[in-house]
Amino acid sequence: MANDKNEDQKEEETKTLQEKYDELLEELDSKNKELAKINEDLEKQKEETQEYISLSQRLQADFENFKKINEKKSKDIIKFANEPLIKNILDSYEDLERALENSKTEKELRDGVELIYSKIKDVLTKEGLEEIPAKGEKFDPFKHEALMVANDENVENGYIIDELMKGYTLKGKVIKYSKVRVCKK
């Protein structure tokens, strides 16, 4: 009987161990499935990361190309900024050549030069060039450069007596100051 009891106890322990073993196998299988899922997710993340890196590299290359293209365009814009003005002056330049070649008398030459002067002045005016008023104006250091001072009884102190060289603005910006003689008493 003791043997039967001992054997029953061993059978019971074996059953319990078998159940624990089966539970552990199930748990191990479950953990292996979780690990496989984690590895799968990790691989997907690696692929996505690689895609983002590739995209980032392509965007960087595109941006560098964009910068180079824009730099070239900017240089071309600066290089050829005066092209419309040159085209407008070319007609007058060619007229001057013809006037010099074809003028037989001094009057013909003068008439041709006056016509050309008028055309050039019109072109420059259309481009926004304006003369700075000087003679009889109050001296303005932002528009005029005083080269000389003189005392003139007919002119108020601080006013311009004579314009020695014309000054100009281009679309409101002074590009050449008027050179003047100013009255100083």
Curated annotation (Swiss-Prot):
Superkingdom: Archaea
Compartment annotation: Cytoplasm
Sorted UniProt keywords: Chaperone, Cytoplasm, Stress response
GO cellular component, one term: cytoplasm
Principal localisation: cytoplasm
One GO MF term attached to the UniProt entry: protein-folding chaperone binding
Single GO BP term: protein folding
Pfam families from the UniProt entry: GrpE
Protein family per UniProt: Belongs to the GrpE family.
Complex formation: Homodimer.
UniProt xrefs under PANTHER family: GRPE PROTEIN, GRPE PROTEIN HOMOLOG, MITOCHONDRIAL
Function: Participates actively in the response to hyperosmotic and heat shock by preventing the aggregation of stress-denatured proteins, in association with DnaK and GrpE. It is the nucleotide exchange factor for DnaK and may function as a thermosensor. Unfolded proteins bind initially to DnaJ; upon interaction with the DnaJ-bound protein, DnaK hydrolyzes its bound ATP, resulting in the formation of a stable complex. GrpE releases ADP from DnaK; ATP binding to DnaK triggers the release of the substrate protein, thus completing the reaction cycle.
Protein name: Protein GrpE
